[in-house]
Amino acid sequence: MKLKIPAWVGTIIGMLSMGMMPALGAEQIKFSYSILEFSLSVTDLKTYAQEGKISSQLAFYTKRLKPEDLAQGRQVLTERQQLSPVAISQFLYSDIGESMLKSAGQLIQTDSGQNGFYAIRAALILAAADPGGLTLLNTMRYFPSQSIRINSEKLFALMNQLSTLNKETNQAIAIIAQQSTTEASTEPPVDISKLPELYNKSGPFSWQKRTIAFVDTNRKSLTGSIKTRVIQTDIYLPQSQTPAPVIVISHGLGSDRDSFAYLAENLASYGFAVVVPQHPGSDSLQMQALLTGRRQQLFPDTELIDRPLDVTFVLDQLEQRSKSDPWLQGKINGQEVGVIGQSFGGYTALVLAGARININQLHKDCKPESDPINVSLLLQCRALALGKNSPDYEQLQQNLSNLDLRDRRVKAVIALNPVTSSIFGQAGLSRIEIPVVIAGGASDTVTPVFWEQIQAFSWLTTKEKYLGIGDKGTHFDLIAGVSTVVLPSSNRFSERDPELGRIRFQAFSTAFMKLYLAHQTEYRPFLSTSYVKNSNRYEPIKVYFVRSLPPEFLQGLVRKK
């Protein structure tokens, strides 16, 4: 349950740019505290990383570190990142990449004390082109300064932010764990022997899969321009005698239709027609295009609008096709739709449920430099760039805040690791009126669970709401298949099998959609706090599951906000 904050060396090496491989100097690293100035030899770091020997100078800094911290620091110093110079260059020249560099450059400065923006970028690109590859030690060789100056004030502020977030997250999870115990004690006992078997078992339906390219030739932008959008979509159709409820799965940034194929197959076996669109502009193909120089941005700003419109368009097309296509005719119930989304897909699901973009909140939270703690703001703040080149920018932004993209066919949603805090805020999320699950992981460094999921849950006003928190969960645990990520992830499956979490998620998703789409009340016990709490006894990964948060905790959130 505890969030690990790396010690001094780990902080500098691994956290300064939230997962981006940093460059720390050529011959020495300098940092000051009050009137004192300290330095650390890069040669000493190299010897330690390659041979494990700690010099007397390095020992001054490492004597208070635990052995596991030292081992982690040594690994990060020598770990090679599989990124080509073209890929790293393309990302660092994108708007999001430059925002990250500016933020990192405030902390990692040149010898003269200037922002390290250009020096870091040059060093990373040159190191990626070196035969030795992009490692921290190799990057040091290319940093265009004899030394690097660490802005100690920024460093201590960063460490304080991390410590505060760690404390708040641990306190929140402890309260949620206690709340789950309280809720379980007030619920009627669940006789597990009388429940349907959902774990490690496919459902009774056979199914067929087809891929259809849906072409929207009339996609309108905020400015009124028209474009064509091709949405490759996998459809998993159960062989059922009655029309099947529909579940849409929306992938995250840089992922694709394969990311949750395991979930789609399982849901289809339980009688759901599963629709998995691939969002052009924020999928793996967009990421590959960026990294090979064929695109300039991680994703177009318009994806914030186009993603939910993709789902609505595909649902419209399926409804039309079901009237004439023998494969679909009489097979789907397009008025009973659920949406499951992860990360950017979680945002998509919440928009379809009725959440609205909160321009006022974004103006309060979005700064010129990225937040080094909450990297998800890089995505959320892109909403402020929508229409920025138009003379009617202010009016377009106002239109965006009033834009209602809810699809009323959507009756229930599950949002995994969604971005929420600034893009929606309380005003945007409180508009949702349908059943919602918000789920996250305590070890998520991309969308911090305290800000992006726990806080978001507290803002929901819908009666049917659920919060699930994995005590060791990361941002990527439930993603299967090959997913393109730009930056090396700090989330590692070290001592746990992600397959266990996916099996539990399959079972929960099936029960949730059976209850709210198929209206089969016998599945309600699976959604009880007591059932989930009982399941924790047999699993290495604990999931804390609640329907509400205690009033005193909510009051604390209001004070922080």
Regions found by a protein language model. Give the residues of each.
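Cap/lid segment of the alpha/beta-hydrolase catalytic domain
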Residues: G254, D258-A261, N266, V275-L309, ...
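Gly/Ala-rich beta-loop-alpha elbow adjacent to hydrolase catalytic centers
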Residues: G252, G341-A349
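Active-site-adjacent alpha-helix of alpha/beta-hydrolase-fold enzymes
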Residues: S430-R502
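Short beta-strand element of the alpha/beta-hydrolase
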Residues: P243-G252
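Alpha/beta-hydrolase active-site loop
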Residues: Q296-G334, C366-A385, Q395-N399
